[in-house]
Amino acid sequence: MCSVAVTGASGFLGQHIIQHLQLNAPWVTEIRAFDMTSFSKALDYKSRLDVSIYTGDIGDTQALRKAFHNVSAVLHVASVIDVQFQPDRKLLRKVNVEGTANVIAACQTEDVPILIYCSTISAVQGYFNCLGGSETDVEDTWPLLFRDYGGTKKEAEWMVLRADKTPLTNGGTLRTVSLIPPTMYGEGDRLIATILQYASDNNGNFIRMGNGKNLEAYAYVGNVAWGFVCCLKTMFNDPNFGNEKMFIMDDTPPQSIQALSKTYLEDRGFKMTSYYIPLSVLFLICLLLEMVCLLISPFKRISFPLSLSAIVFSMQKFYVRYDKAKTLIEYTPLFSVEESNQRSLPYYRNVKLRK
């Protein structure tokens, strides 16, 4: 019997993890959903189990302890993603670092033997190209491209792995693993939805930024969620497995966000412009904006989505492989690239856009 608590259960990835626990993990006997917003099933599937809903802030240790009491495992997915210029550093640290410390402490106090942490590729991505790299190839990356977001996630990952093999109050041991997904797409995603919104606001035309020849790692969210279930099963069956970190990818080809979005834009009757704004021009504009905002920053914090880091990201070739996950947790993508696309299309076709 395996009882599982999922933090960030109401979010993009959390919803898909709950779905796979319902449909593809018959050995799981209880599911608990912890989030700031009360969990409500957002995906179309038939539930096998009633989900126990726990509403609370990740900074509330008592709420975490209540949610984790007598569970077999915790999947810690809750986090703040902020890669814009001048992100909210206090919030990033409060949720990603201090929140993770609270999760670890609650696991130790409530005798939870399994903790699986959701990291991010931003915790290993720097100012260099990486063509099919492994975990060890990028282990000591510094500086990080998205310093604040990636830095807090990297610090939290380090805390989780350092907690491996710590004693529990019942005499047992806490085992920990960190899973590292890339940027994800699929049902619930807001990144491509934002691109659709930009096109809608511009009479159905998405103005390209750069030539789109960069190569970045993307994965279908359903496959990433399946990776968490594979890891959970491995750790549940082998109490000695832990202190590992690994990429969770699928077979989505490395490509630019423009290429990934093209099908979904066209499906809604939108199109990309034949011309594009050179990244060098965007870089200079962004540099000037950042300099002005930094001068103002002692008096007022100004944030905006475009940043120098985002421009550099759009110039890179950075993708990794998931051989380690194949070997250690017997993970293979549940959905092919074609199936992932077919599952994603209805969502992007119907996602609500502002008029």
What does each model-identified segment do?
Residues 2-27:
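N-terminal Rossmann NAD(P)H-binding glycine-rich loop of SDR-like oxidoreductase domains
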Residues 184-186, 209-214, 243-254, 265-268, ...:
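Glycine-rich Rossmann NAD(P)(H)-binding loop
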Residues 221, 228, 245, 290-295, ...:
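Conserved C-terminal active-site "lid" loop/helix of NAD(P)H-dependent oxidoreductases
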Residues 320-328, 332-355:
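Amphipathic terminal alpha-helices
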Residues 47-98, 106:
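NAD(P)H-binding glycine-rich loop region in Rossmannoid oxidoreductase-like domains
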